[in-house]
Structure formats: structure tokens, C-alpha cells
Swiss-Prot record:
Belongs to the ALKAL family. GO terms for biological process: cell surface receptor protein tyrosine kinase signaling pathway; positive regulation of ERK1 and ERK2 cascade; positive regulation of ERK5 cascade; positive regulation of neuron projection development. Transmembrane segments: none annotated. InterPro entries: ALKL1/2. It comes from Mus musculus. This is ALK and LTK ligand 1. GO terms for molecular function: cytokine activity; receptor signaling protein tyrosine kinase activator activity; receptor tyrosine kinase binding; transmembrane receptor protein tyrosine kinase activator activity.
Length: 127
């Protein structure tokens, strides 16, 4: 049997009852989502018994201390014994401490070549 269309007075009464009803009874409650979820499923927030989460530090990647003499070791290996005169020390320090070639491990070989060229340049071999 087909349902008949509700009459106009019945639908008007339903709309009037909906408009006059107090807030919070018309659909969803007036609480925050977190309060509703916590009320419905408190077991979501509790850890499973018998299991223990590892501490945060052990889950992250370990950071090993960097060898500060690594740069010196690499450059001495590539250049051999190189000495700089007192007049050339300013240029050496600028190159050694302030360039990408001498501060990035991937470019240490290039740094060694630059330091070798600086050592034999006319600027540094004036003595």
C-alpha cells in the first residue's frame, strides 16, 4: 500500500514544533566533538593492557656527534703538508672557514685543491 502525502496541517504542526523546541534537541547535541567521542568511546584513549610505547627518543633517528677534526684530516690527506706565510694567513682563513667548498664534506677535495693553489700562488709565495 502506498503512503499518502501528509496533509498540510500536519506538516505545519511539525514545522511549528521544530521551531519552538529548545536548542540541543533538534539534531546533534551542543557539545564539542571531543567530548562526544570521549563519552562514546573511552577505550580509544586508553593504551592496550600489557603493551608499552617506547620512549620518543628511541623512536627517532640517533644523531652521532660529528668529528670536529674530520675536516682537517681530509684536507691534510688530499693536500699533504701545506704551509702558508704570514701574509697569506688572511686569505687562508677566508677560504678555509667561509666557503662552501671547505665547510661541506662533499666538497673537501675541491677545498684541498683550492688551498694547494693558494699556497703556490704568487700572492703567498712572495717571501
Amino acid at each position: 500500500m502506498w503512503l499518502t502525502k501528509p496533509s498540510t496541517p500536519v506538516s505545519a504542526l511539525l514545522l511549528l514544533a521544530l521551531a519552538l523546541s529548545p536548542p540541543g534537541t533538534q539534531g546533534r547535541p551542543q557539545r564539542s566533538l571531543a567530548a562526544r567521542v570521549a563519552e562514546l568511546r573511552p577505550e580509544l584513549f586508553l593504551p592496550v593492557t600489557g603493551t608499552r610505547l617506547p620512549p620518543r627518543a628511541s623512536r627517532s633517528t640517533e644523531i652521532f656527534p660529528r668529528d670536529l677534526t674530520l675536516k682537517d684530516k681530509f684536507i691534510k690527506h688530499f693536500t699533504g703538508p701545506v704551509t702558508f706565510s704570514a701574509e697569506c694567513s688572511k686569505h687562508f682563513h677566508r677560504l678555509y672557514h667561509n666557503t662552501r667548498d671547505c665547510s661541506t664534506p662533499a666538497y673537501y677535495k675541491r677545498c684541498a685543491r683550492l688551498l694547494t693553489r693558494l699556497a703556490v700562488s704568487p700572492l703567498c709565495s712572495q717571501t
